Every structure is written in structure tokens, then in C-alpha cells.
Swiss-Prot record:
Facilitates AcMNPV replication in two non-permissive cell lines, IPLB-Ld652Y and IPLB-LdFB. It comes from Lymantria dispar multicapsid nuclear polyhedrosis virus (LdMNPV). It comes from the Viruses. The gene is HRF-1. This is Host range factor 1. The lineage of its organism: Viruses, Viruses incertae sedis, Naldaviricetes, Lefavirales, Baculoviridae.
Length: 218
């Protein structure tokens, strides 16, 4: 027994019994700048919504659109700000957006990985790399939005690839509970690390441990 449900993406039906259904694709935004979605579910199991996740393949930027009204077509466009810098002359990877669609609600929710393609190396912000390298703890304290998360993560990944080393250690014990809660909220809202919600402490602990290991090898 369980809740029967289904949703449609541009007319393609996906069986989502107990919210287990998923739809994903990498699309060229020139030819598919928006999706038309619709969903329905068996009543008596609470309220359910349809979630449409977008990730720009070249930069790693993430956006989420929530559809709360069932049994009605809804046009969900690719984030407009992404389209502003994508044109016909851009490389194919820069025109690609990965889309993931699933259902979540009161009793059931899709809880698997959101994206299946190789993780992006994020976008390049060289001045940000220098700032974060020089003072990583201060950079963590300044994480207020998705862009800050991406800058921090890319700088960390470039350290991992051996491009340069941090100048100061990152010690998360110096973060108070309020600071950590704020950072945790931003990490969760950006769908970082493939999931809708992420606890910031394991991420920062991993970064700290890696940096300690790196510093010991220098």
C-alpha cells in the first residue's frame, strides 16, 4: 500500500509511486529554455509538491523551482540570469543545463541524489581564490549566498588539484554556533553536494582535515 502519484515533463509521463519517480536530462538551453510540468497524487497522504532542480553544467550554479498546485500545467523556465550570458557562439558545455524533477511531501519524498552527471568544477573567480587562500576562516565567515559557497568550494578544489596552498589553516572550532548555523543554512539552500539539505559541519571538517594534511606535506 502507498500513495499513487505521477508527473509529466513536456508530456512525458513518470510514475512516482510513493514519490520514487525521477526525471533528469541535460538540455541545450537554446532549444529548450523552459519545461512544462504537471503532477497529480492520491489524496489522503498529505500535501505534495513537484521540485524542478537546475544546474548549469559549466559553472555549477544551482537553482530550485517548487510547483505547489497539482493537476495544472506549469511552465518552468531556465533561470533568466543564466540565459543572459549564453548565446549561439558559446561552447556546447556552456549551453548545457542539467534538470532533475521529483516529488516530495508530507509522508513520502524522493531522497536520492539530485544529479547523475560528473560534478562541475564550478566557475573561475581568480581574485576570490586569492582572498580565500589568504584568509580561509574569514572567507567562511562571509558565506552569505550561493555565490560565496561556489567561490569557497572552487578555491578548495583548486587547492586539491595542486594549483596553490592555503596560507593560513582553517579552524572550524573558531566558528561560534550562530555563525555555523548561518553557513549551514546557505549550504542547504544551494543544494550543494548533490542533496537538497547539507550539514555544513562535515563539509568544513573535511576541508579542515584536508588542509592540515596538505600543510603537513609542505
Amino acid at each position: 500500500m502507498g500513495m499513487d502519484a505521477e508527473f509529466f515533463v513536456d508530456g512525458e509521463r513518470v510514475d512516482s509511486y510513493k514519490c520514487t519517480g525521477r526525471w533528469s536530462a541535460i538540455v541545450d538551453v537554446r532549444h529548450r529554455p523552459a519545461l512544462t510540468v504537471r503532477y497529480r497524487y492520491e489524496r489522503g497522504y498529505g500535501h505534495y509538491a513537484l521540485f524542478v532542480y537546475f544546474r548549469h553544467v559549466a559553472t555549477g550554479m544551482l537553482e530550485t523551482e517548487r510547483v505547489d498546485v497539482a493537476d495544472r500545467d506549469r511552465v518552468v523556465p531556465v533561470p533568466e540570469e543564466w540565459l543572459e550570458y549564453i548565446d549561439d557562439d558559446d561552447e556546447e558545455r556552456e549551453r548545457q543545463v542539467e534538470v532533475f524533477v521529483c516529488m516530495k511531501g508530507d509522508c513520502y519524498a524522493h531522497d536520492g541524489p539530485l544529479f547523475v552527471s560528473e560534478a562541475s568544477k564550478w566557475c573561475s573567480r581568480e581574485p576570490e581564490h586569492v582572498r580565500i587562500r589568504d584568509s580561509p576562516l574569514e572567507a567562511v565567515r562571509q558565506i552569505k549566498c550561493a555565490e560565496d559557497v561556489f567561490a569557497f568550494v572552487e578555491a578548495f578544489m583548486r587547492i586539491e588539484e595542486g594549483e596553490y596552498a592555503w596560507r593560513d589553516p582553517l579552524v572550524i572550532d573558531q566558528l561560534n554556533d550562530q555563525e555555523l548555523a548561518s553557513i549551514e543554512k546557505v549550504f542547504a539552500s544551494t543544494v550543494w553536494n548533490y542533496y537538497e539539505k547539507v550539514n555544513a559541519r562535515p563539509v568544513l571538517t573535511f576541508a579542515e582535515n584536508y588542509l592540515k594534511k596538505l600543510n603537513e606535506s609542505l
